[in-house]
Amino acid sequence: MPITKIHARSVYDSRGNPTVEVDVVTETGLHRAIVPSGASTGQHEAHELRDGDKTHWGGKGVLKAVENVNKTIAPAVIEENLDVKDQSKVDEFLKKLDGSANKSNLGANAILGVSLAIAKAGAAEKGVPLYAHISDLAGTKKPYVLPVPFQNVLNGGSHAGGRLAFQEFMIVPSAAPSFSEALRQGAEVYQKLKTLAKKKYGQSAGNVGDEGGVAPDIQTAEEALDLITEAIEQAGYTGKMKIAMDVASSEFYKADVKKYDLDFKNPDSDSSKWLTYEQLADLYKTLASKYPIVSIEDPFAEDDWEAWSYFYKTSDFQIVGDDLTVTNPLRIKKAIETKACNALLLKVNQIGTLTESIQAAKDSYADNWGVMVSHRSGETEDVTIADIAVGLRSGQIKTGAPARSERLAKLNQILRIEEELGNNAIYAGEKFRTSVNL
């Protein structure tokens, strides 16, 4: 069934920045995808094309990327008469059309929009939901696995004010019996946390960050973890709710001295207090002994390979690579070879096509890694990643707090999928790291 039209436009993400939306039209109708974007981006990511014209949107316009879809990609794809069900052929064609290693000619944001919209057209042509189409493309077994929602309830780092260095603190309702129960538990803890934050830090502490988490004026990780632990207790889930962190430590790594500055938001930070990677690793272990931490993302800087390997050898929780791996097959291969981490953070816009995202997950599974499908801080109402998490049996999804519609859109989509699948799906629960084998 041929594609009759491909059209891109500039729309807005959840931060009010422009992003690319792509419509693909076939006989089954109109299929639409919107591309997200990140705030703290890894330097090894596929190239997000921005206009750079400071007089419009502060240089963040995407009119070039939109034009690349409408003038270059659309006519070429339509002329090629590609089968929308054959995603790997579609994505291979898009990569060749761009011709660069990191999609910098046409823009990863242009290519991804087309890739995802065509995937939706492929699912429609097969008459199946998107998650089922993705499951076919990835060759995952059944039953479907519904992911544990890692909910980012408290923000620090580059996502917030205050001196708190670590970027995200997440609650992990892995002991819940189902996805819908997990979401309820998460929402209840989140409401308690908001109330507590306002009580302890003043009314403005209830204000939410880019991903829906609260961002009180917190100074240390212990202070943040104590607040979350208290919220879990008040909601009645002590012992049933775990915690995860995204440290995003590349943001406070001092490469010239190979140290980590936990006071990086202070211009007068005392360099004698900066930590070596061994000291930072000890801090993580101390925190994990005091709090129910099951997962740490980006504990070290993206090119501090030695630190990652050291930590991997000496700890037993999930170590997630995001800035380290940037969903890039070469970086994932290196991380596997150097034993740097044991889980991949999968962000489709870091690599730029659905096929490469699926391959990144499969490469990770092959080495017994976990895979966590992730949103970006600049999100939209597009819910594709919910279907990707279910289709890949990843068992874990990170898509913000149970607040702000662009975050809830994904979680609500998984609720619908749970309802639709009924007994044909299982909740990953405590086995989120190995759910692909369930």
UniProtKB/Swiss-Prot annotation:
What does the record give as EC number? Answer: 4.2.1.11
Q: Which UniProt keywords apply?
A: Cytoplasm, Glycolysis, Lyase, Magnesium, Metal-binding
Q: Name one GO cellular component term.
A: phosphopyruvate hydratase complex
Q: Gene behind this chain?
A: enoA
Q: Which cofactors are named for this entry?
A: Mg(2+)
Quickly give the catalysed reaction.
Answer: (2R)-2-phosphoglycerate = phosphoenolpyruvate + H2O
Task: Report the cofactor remark.
Answer: Mg(2+) is required for catalysis and for stabilizing the dimer.
Q: What is its main location?
A: cytoplasm
Protein name (Swiss-Prot/TrEMBL): Enolase
Provide the assembly information: Homodimer.
